[in-house]
Amino acid sequence: MDCAYERRTPPTEKECLALMYENKVDEHIIAHCQAVAKMVQIILLELSCTNVLLDEDALLSAALLHDIARKEKNHADVGALKLKAMGYVAIGTMIATHMDIEVNVNAPLNENELLFLTDKLVSEDEACGFEKRFEKAFLKCEGNLEAQKNIMKRLNATKMIIKKIENLTGKVFHYG
């Protein structure tokens, strides 16, 4: 019998940290997740003057937990399944798309897109420009055309999400 609830209150920051320790997540991965959550807060503050509706608590919890399965193959899917099994369906859904996402430019900005983006604006536990992050990824995968194709897809998704934010705020995006 599946005991997951359709909707649970998102875990607090303290509860997220406890879940990370319970899942034996390394300190440097926890620090990365905390930096992503800080970036989420910065962008949410910028978006507060817009009419975009987001589940901010769930998004912050997803940021803190997005790499809960980082050491496992297909960590986004594995992490998503873990959170969904605990009853955090919305958070699991966000985590599932933090590595790869399909962006609909005609749809409103959503939590999945913000989690994807903020993860790309943080390297280790430091904010960085997405261009720098993707440049490093391209160099790392030099000669691997399939990997470079996937990186280019992620770069394009990042740019589309940034454009959505710029359209909402009327400002040039300058984070990371």
Residue ranges with predicted function:
Residues C49-C141:
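Divalent metal-dependent catalytic cores for phosphoryl transfer on phosphate-bearing substrates
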Residues I30, Q34-A37, E56-L60, G92-M99, ...:
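Short, well-structured alpha-helical segments
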Residues V25, I29, H75, A107, ...:
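Residue-level recognition of alpha-helical structural elements
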Residues E6-M20, D67, K82-M94, E146-K153:
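Short, charge-rich amphipathic segments
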Residues E146-G176:
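Charged phosphate-binding loop/patch that engages nucleotide di/tri-phosphates or the phosphate backbone
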